[in-house]
Amino acid sequence: MYIIKTTDFFTDKGINKALYDKTLVQTIADVWSENQNLLAIYHTHYKIEFSFTKNNTLHYVMIEEITPQEQKQPFQCEFIDDMDIFKKSLNDIKTLFKRTTTDNNITIDEVLIHFEDEKVDSLYYFPYSASITNTEFRTTNAPQ
């Protein structure tokens, strides 16, 4: 089983490098887009979304809370919010990371935290970006 923790996004180590492999993620994903560049795993309380570029390089991993679901099969990838990031308000995050918001986003190195109604909506991890700009942020509904 692969475990992704919030703290993984904020360390030099990052997430398990095996999850950079599109072929592996395809074998554990619950759903995927038509072109298979967007793959998602639905764990009990979180959706874990992997976005790959056309050359199969991991572009980002996105985590968002979902309505708790009943597990129909054993899961192979899990997200643990060990920083309770999804329980924090916009002001909590600004204070914790000493950052300001731009267009409902706070960026910290390879991480972009997106807010809706001053609550954390989603957490993005861009493994190959030294720093994120808002032009790199795409919603999950964006065409590939």
Please state what every model-predicted region is.
Residues 1-109, 114-144:
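Short helix/turn-capping signatures at newly exposed starts of structured segments
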